[in-house]
Amino acid sequence: MNKKQLILLCMLAVGGSVQAQQWPDTPAEARPGTRWWWLGSAVDEKNLTYNLEEYARTGMGAVEITPIYGVQGNDANEIQFLSPRWMEVLKHTQAEGKRTGIEIDMNTGTGWPFGGPEVSIEDAATKAIFQTYNLEGGKEIEQDINVTDPKQQPYSILSRVMAYDEKGKCINLTAYVKKDKLQWKAPAGKWKVIALYIGKTRQKVKRAAPGGEGYVMNHLSKKAVKNYLSRFDRAFKNSKTSYPHTFFNDSYEVYQADWTDDFLEQFARRRGYKLEEHFPEFLNESRPEVSRRIVSDYRETISDLLLENFTCQWTDW
């Protein structure tokens, strides 16, 4: 080894030593995090402490608590979600997280999507139910108008009954329906009558933890989302527990949740025309140009309501 090589090696060794000494501590947000499944919320202080110490030892910076269904045969150790005992173990977890340098995050619910025992059928995920009747005009018409799906009959609400002739004329017949019967002196011609019912998806929370079972909420309703979040406000306030570092949403896996109570009013205000005057085009599965444009407006309105009534309200909360 010549003199130049020896000098270079010495410089590299000194430089590496200086860099190692100057390297800053890695903050929690720069370290990896992990999902922390609480199976049945069957947890206790001793084991929570042990797990957090192990997470810290291996370099973890955050955990995301998600309560989920329990292990078969371990029911006796399960804790009801947001119960006083559940809040106790969460408070312990937060204290230990602070001690070990780990940020504690939490799902705003159990399993997925958001929902639970305090979600009433009124606040549950909502869908549109359309029924079509082809009627001959030029006479007094008496037609039964009722939702045919027996599972929807206890919950569905009649929203609109609209009539359309072959020339595109539209008449709102909602006021002519009394006790599930349409009574209408129809002008001559062939009429397509479309009834819109506001129904419920009846979807339940998937993989719910004990105390988290119930209907999925209506993410498109400002009132339903507010009511859902109020359960958390009460639990944290009554137990004097600090909110976690971050709340998160596991997923938005809702099925057929394509409507909300004031959707028609919201659509008219945002898109500048009444969707109910174009139900035939909206429901046309062959999708000509006008139908595609109407469906696009419908989807944009759904997007607006999801953003404003769920995402923004939840984030502001």
Language-model regions: role of each:
Residues M1-Q21:
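Bacterial Sec-dependent N-terminal signal peptides
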Residues Q21-T26, R31, V43, N47-T49, ...:
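Mature extracytoplasmic enzyme cores
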Residues L39, T66, D250:
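Conserved residues at the C-terminal ends of beta-strands
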Residues T66-I79:
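Glycine-rich, proline-tolerant flexible connector loops at the mouths of alpha/beta enzymes
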